[in-house]
Amino acid sequence: MPDSQATPRIVLASSSPSRLSILRSAGVEPVVQVSGVDEDAAMQRLIDEAASQGRTPTPAEKVCHLAKAKANAVLEDGLQLGEGDVLIGGDSMLLLDGELQGKPHTAEETVRRWQQQRGKRAELITGHAIYHDGHWFEGSSATSVFFADASDKDIEAYAASGEPWGCAGAFTLEALGGWFIDRIEGDPSSVIGLSLPLVRQALEHFGLSVSDFWNR
């Protein structure tokens, strides 16, 4: 049996260094379990299901669906959760000019994205799927991001750094990318990858306290 006196764990179903950093800076050392889920296939299933109902999934539905797919994949891989443990899946995408954008993956695509988004306002949407004791809490957080009118030289240098390749929207708020964000309106932790207010709401929904998970 799990030790009832032990600090409960947060298990993070994500390989994102940013999500890990958010939790660590908030006093939590999570257990990281990378899901390996096929995100394209998971998204296509959602689109097909919505089409069968004569509708198109919303951006919030899409990111929450991918977040849950990641967490579910970890559960299906045989993750053993102790009493009090919580599993978190997350996914972020940028809504720009009516189009959802994920990670650029290459320098060339990063340059193309930034040439499109510089000087504009976009919405960074982060979906969360949080599992505890057989129950799910799902929710999304949307934050407005106002991009600077960055020069071609700076865009190319930022792309060459490799930093934004694995980031939704081809930018980071907390590192080099911070030079090119004029301001945000909303939750900064959500832009980085995980909304601490939303996670707190989920824990409270389950009858848990944030401080139960502090382990530093």
Stretches with model-predicted labels:
Residues 28-31, 105-107:
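Glycine-rich, phosphate-binding/catalytic loops in enzymes
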Residues 15, 35, 133:
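Cofactor-binding loop segments of dinucleotide-utilizing enzymes, especially the Rossmann-like FAD-
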Residues 30-41:
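A short beta-strand-loop structural module common to alpha/beta enzyme folds
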Residues 18, 38-40, 136:
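Surface-exposed, flexible loop/turn segments at secondary-structure boundaries
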Residues 39-61:
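Charged, glycine/proline-rich intrinsically disordered loops and linkers
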Residues 2-9, 53-216:
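Anionic-ligand binding patches
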Residues 5-28:
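N-terminal beta1-alpha1 ligand-phosphate binding loop
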